[in-house]
């Protein structure tokens, strides 16, 4: 387990028209299709994560390559937190759906 029950992770958020606080024009199906496409690319080359986050993520963390920094339990929505804490360091999640859209999560520490 991470020290002090905290981990460090990055993510790519693909929002859609049904996402909370969304300005996206992507349908839910289009967003999932894009998330799956990016997931396939990242499974082949995880080092592309930062560039893909900068170019595709709807989150303000995109400018930092998707980095969310360090966070503990209870700081993120449940589905995101469970997926992030289940990952090993430098592992990538499948697309995870939350009220904000689809996330690809990479555990950094």
Locate each region found by the language model:
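Short beta-strand/turn micro-motifs at beta-sheet edges
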Residues: 1-2, 93
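Well-structured core secondary-structure elements of compact alpha/beta domains
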Residues: 2-44, 60-75, 105-109
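FKBP-type peptidyl-prolyl cis-trans isomerase
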Residues: 7-17, 49-57, 80-83, 94-109
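Sec-exported extracytoplasmic/periplasmic mature domains
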Residues: 39-47, 54-58, 85, 89
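Glycine-rich, flexible loop/turn motifs
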Residues: 64-67, 88, 92
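Short, solvent-exposed helix-to-loop capping segments enriched in aromatics
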Residues: 75-87
């Amino acid at each position: 387990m991470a020290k002090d029950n905290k981990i460090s992770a990055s993510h790519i958020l693909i929002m859609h028209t049904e996402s909370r606080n969304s300005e996206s024009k992507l349908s839910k199906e289009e967003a999932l299709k894009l998330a799956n496409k990016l997931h396939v690319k990242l499974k082949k080359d995880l080092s592309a994560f930062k560039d893909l986050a900068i170019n595709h993520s709807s989150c303000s963390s995109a400018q930092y390559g998707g980095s969310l920094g360090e966070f503990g339990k209870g700081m993120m929505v449940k589905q995101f937190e469970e997926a992030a804490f289940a990952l090993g360091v430098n592992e990538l999640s499948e697309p995870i759906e939350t009220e904000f859209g689809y996330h690809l999560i990479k555990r950094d520490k």
